[in-house]
Amino acid sequence: MESLRLLGDAPRVAHVLAALAAILLIALAGRSLARVLRQPVVIGEIVVGLLSGPVVIALFGRDTLDAALPGPVFDVVKLIAQAGLVLFLVGLAHTLGAADSGGPRRGGTLWVATGALVPPLLTGLLLAGLVLASDDTAARGDAPLPAFVLMVAVSMSITAVPVMARILADRGMTRSAAGQTALAAALVIDAVGWLLLTLAISLGAGSLDGVLHSVGALAFGAVCALAVRHGLRTRAARSLCARLPRTAAVLLGAVALAVALAMEHLGMTAVLGAALVGLAIPRGTDAPWERAVTAVSRAGGALAPAFFVVTGITVLTGSFTDTSWRLISAAVVLGCVGKGLGGYLGARRGGRPPRTARRVAVLMNTRGLTELIVLQAGLSSGILTGPIVLALIVMALTTTAMTGPLLTLLDRAERRPTTAAYAVATESRVR
């Protein structure tokens, strides 16, 4: 409510706009750096965002950061940035639903989700076991054992929907088989991951009420999606969309934001709300919503980079000392193996050809932003400690940064046989 009252204060509104402009400039700098390093631009946005807070604090002190982004101003900026991400994901989820409507494809998606969820959970259990066996009290902390083990396992199993969505869009893979399979599986993992996260926090607090609350939130989201689908199929809604496409786009965006924020208020993630609305939007010749969806997604895409920067600013402003390189190395290796191997085997079991399965495996290792949110939840709840959070942050950034180069490497490797075969055929014809 304080954030909404802020919008009526002209000087504060100017402060919000200035802060938002500065954050978008930070995102632009991150994108430029990523292009120089031949990384997906979203990696640059996240890394620069992560470094922004610690750099400002180190150079100018915490008071300077608080003055530049006081609580009420930062809350409004974060809300605007989150709205951009929600609108951007509505378009991607709608595209995903249009391509993944068949039974066999959906079954394959579930196999990918299983492969990219269960093995990483097991590697997370192994990492937690290594911490316990090492008797590293700084990394272990004093949280209840079940809560600690489950939280580490969940942290290793995350795939970041927002970051993957940006990578797919930047590389033109949104409509590819690998891209749609990976994004659909990531949405399933996201839903399961948030339930497991709630369970871990509940175990840490000594109560399971939060789990039941999360199940209820998912049911609420499903009901909202069904209501949206029914409403958009009515004659009045179709007529409005055909006659006033801009008005229809504004109303569609408002509905998506309402459902997403309601899901977050109920303890889930706004990403799920956006995905549910995008999947619920009717498709086909009798449902003229494509133009409105495109407008909504483009508007969100302009603000989505700010979300990565805003979230990154809040993550690395605490103390993360006493982290051993052995712990960091174990987290990185186990993170790569669990997601990569599990994602590949799941894709092959789901009927995907080796070429698609390799790309799915690479994409499922995209953690990035969602991992940071989960780690922040584990740290703020007292279940995870600074040292293990830092190790998992390094793991998340490393595996995510590998996504772009590995996809490029796969493209080049698969082009070589084709080029070689063409050269041989040409030489034979000349002879």
Language model: regions and residue ranges:
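Short helical (or helix-break) motifs at transmembrane helix termini and adjacent helical loops
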Residues: 87, 95, 123, 148-196, ...
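Entry/N-cap segments of selected transmembrane alpha helices
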Residues: 6-8, 12-26, 71-75, 96-133, ...
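Hydrophobic alpha-helical transmembrane segments in multi-pass integral membrane proteins
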Residues: 57-61, 121-130, 191-202, 255-269, ...
